[in-house]
Amino acid sequence: MDYTLTRIDPNGENDRYPLQKQEIVTDPLEQEVNKSVYMGKLEHALHDMVNWGRKNSIWPYNFGLSCCYVEMVTSFTAVHDVARFGAEVLRASPRQADLMVVAGTCFTKMAPVIQRLYDQMLEPKWVISMGACANSGGMYDIYSVVQGVDKFIPVDVYIPGCPPRPEAYMQALMLLQESIGKERRPLSWVVGDQGVYRANMQSERERKRGERIAVTNLRTPDEI
């Protein structure tokens, strides 16, 4: 079988992810509250209850590509105990999972497989890109490695590092839970575009920039 690498054209017509239609809008529930106090508050409570159940029962797909996967499964040990976040139920089938963690190097031959597995996951579903290789290709600036999995699937949380520690993976789960808690999805089955409203989350780099600039006493590499 012949494999070819097709470059992404950001100006081309493409209605598939990650080049899907996105726009910044206000929270639709705020408009409903102003229209009807009772129904608006009821819908707000229903969304909060559903999102609470979703964010505390994330089932990750047992899927690893490289050494970052070793750090991911380390978080399932008793030392880290990722079960505290409700994400310890590993699924061997994408149809039973709602979180895909792309942990490792994504080669061009593997990209169609990841794409197909992502398509087999049911909504709601989320993606975590774990490690420098999955985020941007890492040190493999070569034709055979995809320079970031967000070239063909949408990514919700990026974990930097080569490889990241298990604590970084658990922090990503907490950030994903925070994002899920602010989502607005249809409360019933929807065929086609669901029209999901996601909160505009601030990146950790921007959030911690002021704190890092204020640091004056830097520890030596010999200190922990």
From Swiss-Prot:
[4Fe-4S] cluster binds at C67, C68, C133, C162. InterPro entries: NADH_UbQ_OxRdtase-like_20kDa (IPR006137), NADH_UQ_OxRdtase_20Kd_su (IPR006138). GO terms for biological process: aerobic respiration; electron transport coupled proton transport. Transmembrane segments: none annotated. Pfam families: Oxidored_q6 (PF01058). Belongs to the complex I 20 kDa subunit family. This is NADH-quinone oxidoreductase subunit B. It comes from Klebsiella pneumoniae subsp. pneumoniae (strain ATCC 700721 / MGH 78578).
